[in-house]
């Protein structure tokens, strides 16, 4: 049995030789799967421009489905969906123009440096526990979309209300 070629776009494998690979890469199924893959990464502005340039799909409007699916040359987006997409684009533009406008939870470098200096000073003077208590009481903002993910790994769960218990192990083994 020879080597096998696996196509990530189509999720299938076949014997790897020049004829089979060329036949697959030029096939309609591969082109559709590849287009669908790259369409997942298109930004909202290009998606909106493409949908606006298309006419509305009458079959989709009448029945709620279209036999051509994503390869249909007509638009399947409603006016409401287009408005939501426009709003998303406007929000992204505002975010790029002024990222500090909405009071993002990201800290500046100066804040980080001042906190680092406080920690180092606390370590030298022995006030480590008090500093950790102050950090736990800070207001931690968790993005709402993060909590909506069903199987979130434990490392991404928000910290408990009282903070984690700190245990100091002086001995190894």
From Swiss-Prot:
Quaternary organization: Component of the U11/U12 snRNPs that are part of the U12-type spliceosome.
GO molecular function: zinc ion binding
Keyword terms: Metal-binding, mRNA processing, mRNA splicing, Nucleus, Spliceosome, Zinc, Zinc-finger
One GO CC term, this protein: U12-type spliceosomal complex
PANTHER family referenced in this protein's UniProt entry, alphabetically: NUCLEASE-RELATED (PTHR16465), ZINC FINGER MATRIN-TYPE PROTEIN 5 (PTHR16465:SF0)
Gene that this sequence comes from: zmat5
Region described as Disordered: 83-111
ZnF bounds (C3H1-type): 51-79
Protein name per Swiss-Prot or TrEMBL: Zinc finger matrin-type protein 5
Record localization: Nucleus
Biological processes, Gene Ontology terms: mRNA processing; RNA splicing
Pfam families assigned: zf-CCCH_4, zf-U1
């Amino acid at each position: 049995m020879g080597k096998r070629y696996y196509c990530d776009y189509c999720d299938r494998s076949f014997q790897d030789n020049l004829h089979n690979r060329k036949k697959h890469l030029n096939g309609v199924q591969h082109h559709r799967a590849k287009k669908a893959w790259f369409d997942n990464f298109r930004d909202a502005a290009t998606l909106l421009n493409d949908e606006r340039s298309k006419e509305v799909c009458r079959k989709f409007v009448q029945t709620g489905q279209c036999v051509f699916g994503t390869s249909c040359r007509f638009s399947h987006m409603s006016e409401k969906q287009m408005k939501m997409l426009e709003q998303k684009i406007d929000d992204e533009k505002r975010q790029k123009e002024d990222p500090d406008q909405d009071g993002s939870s990201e800290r500046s470098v100066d804040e980080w440096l001042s906190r680092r200096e406080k920690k180092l000073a606390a370590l030298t003077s022995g006030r480590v526990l008090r500093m950790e208590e102050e950090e736990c009481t800070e207001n931690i903002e968790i993005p709402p979309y993060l909590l909506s993910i069903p199987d979130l790994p434990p490392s991404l769960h928000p910290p408990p209300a009282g903070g984690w218990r700190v245990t100091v192990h002086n001995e190894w083994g």
